[in-house]
């Protein structure tokens, strides 16, 4: 879950 959330945040940023 952590890696997935990190990837989503990085995609938005």
Curated annotation (Swiss-Prot):
Main localization category: secreted
Keyword Secreted tagged: yes
Signal peptide: none
Subcellular localization: Secreted
Gene Ontology CC annotation, any one: extracellular region
Distribution of this protein across tissues and organs: Expressed by the skin glands.
A GO BP entry: defense response to bacterium
Residue positions where Leucine amide is found in the record: 13
Alphabetic keyword roster: Amidation, Amphibian defense peptide, Antibiotic, Antimicrobial, Cytolysis, Hemolysis, Immunity, Innate immunity, Secreted
Family: Belongs to the frog skin active peptide (FSAP) family. Temporin subfamily.
Functional summary from the UniProt entry: Has no antibacterial activity. Has hemolytic activity.
Name listed for the protein in its UniProt record: Temporin-1Td
